[in-house]
Design a protein with these regions (language model features):
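Single conserved hydrophobic/aromatic residue that forms the stacking wall/gate
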Residues: 1-14
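A short alpha-helical element within helix-turn-helix/winged-helix DNA-binding domains
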Residues: 43-53
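Alpha-helical residues within the helix-turn-helix
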Residues: 50, 67-68
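Key DNA-contact positions within bacterial/archaeal DNA-binding proteins
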Residues: 57
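Beta-hairpin "wing" of winged helix-turn-helix
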Residues: 70-79, 83-85
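Conserved segment of winged-helix/HTH DNA-binding domains
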Residues: 88-114
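C-terminal regulatory/oligomerization modules of transcriptional regulators
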Residues: 109-177
Length: 177
């Protein structure tokens, strides 16, 4: 296992590699909190945004995207709120990525090889070598995100931290259907 100091160094360094929207991280924690709900209960976006100390209006957009992707159930009405639509072991980081970041390709090529090479050599260019490299990176990223489930993350949290306060907060802020 890596030391905590080494893990922090890697996290700091990793931030410069690729940037996901802040909504992606918020979505992860929303799903982890919804997982703690008692059966037949929901939680409001206001309660979730208060706990995470994030904008309620922005979090509502995040939750709407999670509902659209089929990761969260939405119940309307006086006792309405949100709940998980599937267990954490069936939700991958890639599922969350698709919900929050969209289904577009990660790297959209501008096909600059032909203008880069010039008129004569550019005519010979088939596939842009930069695009090919970025496609390889994209496939690796998708594979990696698809291999990590929220259940794995949740198990690490449960093992490392005492969740008494969080569990009590969930019970206090959940609403029975």
């Amino acid at each position: 296992h890596l030391s905590i100091r080494r893990q922090r160094q890697m996290c700091i360094r990793d931030r410069s590699i690729m940037k996901l929207s802040k909504g992606w991280e918020q979505a992860v924690y929303v799903l982890l909190m919804l997982n703690l709900l008692p059966e037949h209960c929901v939680m409001t976006s206001t309660a979730l945004s208060d706990r995470l100390n994030v904008s309620d209006s922005y979090l509502k957009k995040i939750i709407k995207a999670l509902v659209k992707e089929g990761l969260v159930n939405s119940t309307t009405g006086k006792h309405g709120g949100f709940s998980l639509s599937k267990p954490l072991n069936q939700i991958t980081f890639y599922d969350i990525f698709l919900a929050i970041e969209g289904r577009d390709t990660i790297f959209a090529s501008q096909q600059l090889l032909k203008p880069f090479l010039g008129e004569n050599e550019g005519q010979k260019a088939e596939m842009c070598v930069v695009s090919h490299a970025l496609n390889t990176i994209q496939h690796t990223l998708i594979s990696t995100l698809s291999s990590i489930t929220l259940d794995e993350v949740n198990q690490t949290i449960v093992t490392k931290y005492r969740l008494n306060d969080l569990n009590q907060w969930v019970i206090t802020n959940s609403k029975t259907l």
